[in-house]
Amino acid sequence: DASECLQIFSDQENYFPSSVQVSVAPRSQLSKISTIVQTAGLFSIDYGSSFKVITEHMAKEQYVLVQCGAPNVTEAEIDAVAPLPSQQHTRKTFRVPLRQIATESTVQLSYLHELGLADRVEFTSKYAVGPCWQKSKACNGGYEGAWGDAVTKATQDASVDAIFVDCSAAPCSSSSNPKEVHFSASQDPGPLNTAEHIKFMAAFFNKEDQANTIFAKTLRDYNNLIQAPAANAPKVAWIEFAAQSSWSAESFKVSMAGYKTRYITHAGGLNLDVSAMQSSLGSKLVVADVVPGVPLSGQKLTLATSGYSSKSEASTAFFAALADVDVVIDETYAPTPSSYSFSSFLTNFDLTSASALPFIANQKVFRIDGTISSENNLDWFESRLMHPQWVLGDLKDALHGTGGSRKYLRNIAASESPQVITSSSCTTLLPACNDATTSEAIPMLFTPASVSSAMRHAVP
């Protein structure tokens, strides 16, 4: 679209003026409780006059984003703006705004939705939840990904400008595919850090001004919800039962992932004391980093039932260590979330409804499947990343009974059912469905100054 690209280029113009640039907020600004804010960010953005450079620290990649219609930039010009941090870092170049993209997972989708970019997503994750993503999948818009059919994936990759991917472990090695972009939102350690990745996404589409506005509101809404925990605040545990499988022994688990413990603290709750659990369960309790080698990711605690004479005995020991927990969030996998009930919970954890445990006696047993797709995929793994304020609101209601509605948390002890999202509510015209041949135009970020014709030259 002519309105998205330069028709005449001037080396005297600044096509990305400071008024529309993004800057990654200092970590100390991302929470009122400064003691729990992490100081590490996973990306940074620097601007030249006609290009911008995103440095993605986890993948050790730089993405050079050149305004369409501007001439190519040299390595020396890029180095003057953002030199490579190390010899391990590599560079990839894209023309922005991107026209058509693919997304490997659900992680990126809520960011794209908030920026109004659904009409630029040609292929999306087959596990997507949002109405328009489900509509796209039904029109053969499902992305094959690394584990799909290689021939189909190659065809899909060839038809798009970029493929947004993520990884689940560190270090996340750079990809040799020149179109792949690593989106590290799910690896950033804090709820607001994660939400700030909307600025990363926006830079590929010249939507920085919109991203600044969205994130400012998210930051304000989240901080307005923060509640410092009192001494007698409810104690919360994120638990899971893992059945025997070819890759896992039967076990009871507790997640102390960094983002989860921060959410609980911000909601005015108390987290488990890992040392106390270790004292109670001894060497039978295995404690490890959620992401191996990354302490900031938090800890996962595993108690194998094989260390006891029976599952029942293991359950007794496990819940003796959780005897003062007021609220549990059960993350046990269920292929059909709507069929997972309070009875399922009791069976999995070898408990009875007559138990004196506070979370059973007071009906405080929640799951994270409060909103799902028609194909049983959880919105928790999609929109939560972009909307930490929604999660915090859910948790405050679960802990303190604020009377608000909840999007992600479902109280199975109170027989609540999941809300199911379908494609019928999507009204966006999508490329995968041949609703439209072009995407909605994205205006350039600058207003051209008056430049003499002698200083201007058309771009070849």
Describe the function of each predicted region.
Residues 1-458:
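N-terminal ligand-binding lobe of clamshell/alpha-beta domains
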